[in-house]
UniProtKB/Swiss-Prot annotation:
Membrane topology note: Multi-pass membrane protein
Keyword Transport attributed: yes
Tree of life domain: Eukaryota
Organismal lineage: Eukaryota, Fungi, Dikarya, Ascomycota, Saccharomycotina
Protein name as catalogued: Vacuolar amino acid transporter 2
Gene name of the record: AVT2
Purpose of the protein: Probable amino acid transporter of unknown specificity.
């Protein structure tokens, strides 16, 4: 809330009208997202719009279609608690037990801060998208940078989600049809399942135009994610001796040299900055204050879930920990197969949210190349453009996922490059460009430190991941 006070003087009347439309009850409606129960009691402060005004009626109807605070939380939590959560034991393996704890606390604070910075930057710049804000302060080069960053993050995420579908759903179906003896039927093979599930479930969901339409699916996805975490926590210690890890070095208890690889994996799990503007503008009666509260709750819950999954998984598997912790369990374990089914369902609903972002990025890039006319943050793709772009993105990402299964390395590279740029470098840098004249050197220092932190993760983690990939030390992740 202190950030709001700092920037309030910079906001003009038009921006407050656009971004904090609500804070008064509309006639005939109840704002179930109000900050307290006293809203509406002071009639002197209530502005009653003219219901005969067509424009006012249109605004009211459009506002009613948007997500409540609860549904916005589900969308944000689902964006955070996505594929990255099952790689958390791998993150602890790379960071060490103490290093992992410090990583969760530090990244939790930083991600929470930069998420709120994005919305504050939107308000200050009077824009509706993350890329629009960056373009406002950095010009066309800035817009292209954030478009490529957002696009590559979402693109890599979509590939990862398809990989996870191949890691989870086949195990469940093979257990149901008793196909775990090595002779796997054609229809139960990994790549066949990826193609079938993506084509007939993820693809239709990806055709949705509005992110609000995914709110109910996001609610079910968040519930399924909680089931997954609890299943790993409870079932892991009950595994037979041969499936568990038994080797712990002294460095595993403290902080390891590969901690930057861990920061990349955790960053991928927590970063959802490319979705932020969409979720903010999908909120009913939106305001920066409400988004601040939403962000605090979502980040706290997400960090707790990630840490619980990370430490419980690493405690069981230790040196045997894989990039996807579910692949460390037997394929015939009934409880884990239920968790795999839940996780596969979670990917089916998270995948369309990434496609939503990716489609917007492609639309903007095509517009910059003059291949699409009149496309900006206030317009939508035509029906034909929507179908062609969505179909291309879904099946290209699906096709790439058929060629690899090293989830840990994929998320490390995405986290080290695009997530660092999108979450740790651009939000504070954009804010500095918008407000630097009104800040003292001490006030600017945290922004500079965050930017340096982002570059450190990008350079060190990427280098370590590429070296390991070249040496082939992560090949065991593909043995499922």
């Amino acid at each position: 809330m202190s950030e709001l006070g700092e920037y309030s003087k910079l906001e003009n009347k038009e921006l407050r009208t656009e971004f904090e439309l609500t804070n008064f009850p509309f006639p005939g409606t109840t704002d179930n997202d109000s900050d307290d129960g006293s809203q509406g009691q002071n009639s002197l402060n209530i502005i009653t719009p003219d219901m005969d005004d067509t424009l006012v009626n249109d605004v009211l109807r459009e506002n009613d279609k948007k997500s409540s605070m609860r549904m916005a939380f589900m969308n944000l939590a689902n964006s955070i608690l996505g594929a990255g959560i099952i790689t958390q034991p791998f993150a602890i393996k790379n960071a060490g037990i103490l290093g992992g704890l410090l990583s969760y606390v530090a990244l939790g604070f930083i991600v929470d801060w930069t998420l709120r910075l994005i919305v504050i930057n939107l308000t200050l710049a009077g824009k509706r998208t993350y890329q629009g804000t960056v373009e406002h302060v950095m010009g066309k080069k800035g817009k292209l940078l954030i478009l490529f960053t957002n696009g590559l993050f979402a693109f890599g995420g979509c590939i990862g989600y398809c990989i996870i579908i191949g890691d989870t759903i086949p195990h469940v179906l093979r257990a149901i049809f008793s196909q775990n003896d090595g002779n796997v039927h054609f229809w139960l093979r990994r790549n066949v399942i990826i193609v079938m599930v993506t084509t007939f479930i993820s693809f239709p969901l990806s055709m949705k135009r509005n992110i609000e339409a995914l709110s109910k699916a996001s609610f079910l996805a968040v519930i399924s994610m909680i089931i997954i975490v609890l299943t790993v926590v409870i079932r892991g210690p009950m595994l037979p001796y041969d499936w568990k890890g038994h080797s712990l070095k002294l460095s595993d208890f403290f902080m390891k040299a590969t901690i930057f690889r861990s920061l990349s994996v955790i960053s991928f799990a927590l970063v959802c900055h490319h979705n932020t503007s969409f979720i903010f503008f999908s909120m009913r009666n939106r305001s920066v204050a409400k988004f601040t509260r939403l962000t605090h709750i979502s980040i706290i819950i997400s960090v707790i879930c990630c840490a619980l999954m990370g430490y419980s998984g690493f405690a069981v598997f230790k040196e045997k920990t894989k990039g996807n912790v579910l692949n460390s369990f037997p394929g015939t374990d009934t409880a884990i197969n239920i968790a795999r089914l839940c996780f596969g369902f979670n990917m089916l609903t998270t995948f369309p949210m990434e496609i939503f972002v990716l489609r917007d990025v492609v639309g903007n890039l095509l517009h910059e190349c003059n291949l699409i006319k009149n496309y900006d943050e206030h317009t939508q793709l035509s029906g034909k453009q929507h179908v062609v772009i969505t179909s291309s993105l879904v099946f290209i990402t699906m096709g790439i996922s058929l060629t690899t299964c090293n989830l840990g390395a994929l998320f490390e590279l995405i986290g080290a490059t695009t997530a660092s740029t999108m979450a740790y470098i651009l939000p504070p840098y954009t804010n500095l460009l918008l407000t630097s004249k009104k800040k003292s050197w001490k006030e600017r220092l945290p922004f500079y430190l965050c930017i340096c932190f982002g570059f450190m993760i990008m350079i060190i983690s990427s280098t370590q991941t590429i070296i390991d990939a070249v040496n082939g030390s992560d090949g065991q992740h593909c043995q499922i």
